[in-house]
Amino acid sequence: MADSIEDAVSRAMSESPERNFRETVDLAINLRDLDLADPNNRVDESIVLPSGTGQDTHIVVFAEGETALRAEDVADDVLDSDDLEDLGDDDNAAKDLADETDFFIAEADLMQDIGRYLGTVLGPRGKMPTPLQPDDDVVETVNRMKNTVQVRSGERRTFHTRVGAEDMDADAIADNVDVILRRLFTDLEKGPQNIDTVYVKTTMGPAVEVPA
C-alpha cells in the first residue's frame, strides 16, 4: 500500500500548477455503509504524523506555576486561571481564540474551570483541551501536538485532513497518509470496507485517487 500511496502523492504534487503561495497537501476520505447519525460511528481522532504536518500548528496551554513557565518556551500562548475567567466574560474573545487555535492543552486541575467558562465555545468545535496529568512533560506534549492533526468526520461521509505541504518529500507525506489510513482501518466498524474512496491533493491542485 505504501508504494501506491507515494505514487498518488507524487502525481498530485507534480500535476499541481505552480502558485505564488505555499500549498498544503490534503487527504479527502469518503466513507460508506455507516450511519453517521450515530455518534459512535463518526471519526474523531487525534493522530500524530510521523513526518509532521508541514505547517505551523497553533497551540495554547492553560497552566499555572512551573508548568506555565516551561510551556512558554514551546507553546504559542500560555494562559492562567485569571485569563480563563476573563475569557469567560468575553464571548467574542473566547470564540476568536478557539478559531485561531489548533489544539489546547490544560493542566488537569484547570479542566473543570475550562468546562465552566469555555465549554460552550470549545465543545461544539471539538477543541476541548487535552488534559495534562501531573507526571506529563508539558514540553513533550506540546511538541507532540505540533505534529498532530485532528481527523473528524462529523455527520459527513466526506471529510478532509492536512497531511503535509508541497515542499515536503512525497515519501514523507505518504508515511503520514499511511498512518492515518491504518488508524481508520482499525477504528471503523468494518475497517477498509467502510472506506469508499481516498484522494490526495494540493490546496489548488487536482485530486488524485489513492488505490485501496
Swiss-Prot record:
NCBIfam families reported in the protein's UniProt record: PRK04203.1 (NF003244)
Swiss-Prot/TrEMBL GO biological process terms: regulation of translation; translation
Subunit structure: Part of the 50S ribosomal subunit.
Task of the protein: Binds directly to 23S rRNA. Probably involved in E site tRNA release. Protein L1 is also a translational repressor protein, it controls the translation of its operon by binding to its mRNA.
Gene name, Swiss-Prot/TrEMBL: rpl1
A single cellular component GO annotation: large ribosomal subunit
Keyword field: Repressor, Ribonucleoprotein, Ribosomal protein, RNA-binding, rRNA-binding, Translation regulation, tRNA-binding
Protein name as catalogued: Large ribosomal subunit protein uL1
Species whose genome carries this gene: Natronomonas pharaonis (strain ATCC 35678 / DSM 2160 / CIP 103997 / JCM 8858 / NBRC 14720 / NCIMB 2260 / Gabara) (Halobacterium pharaonis)
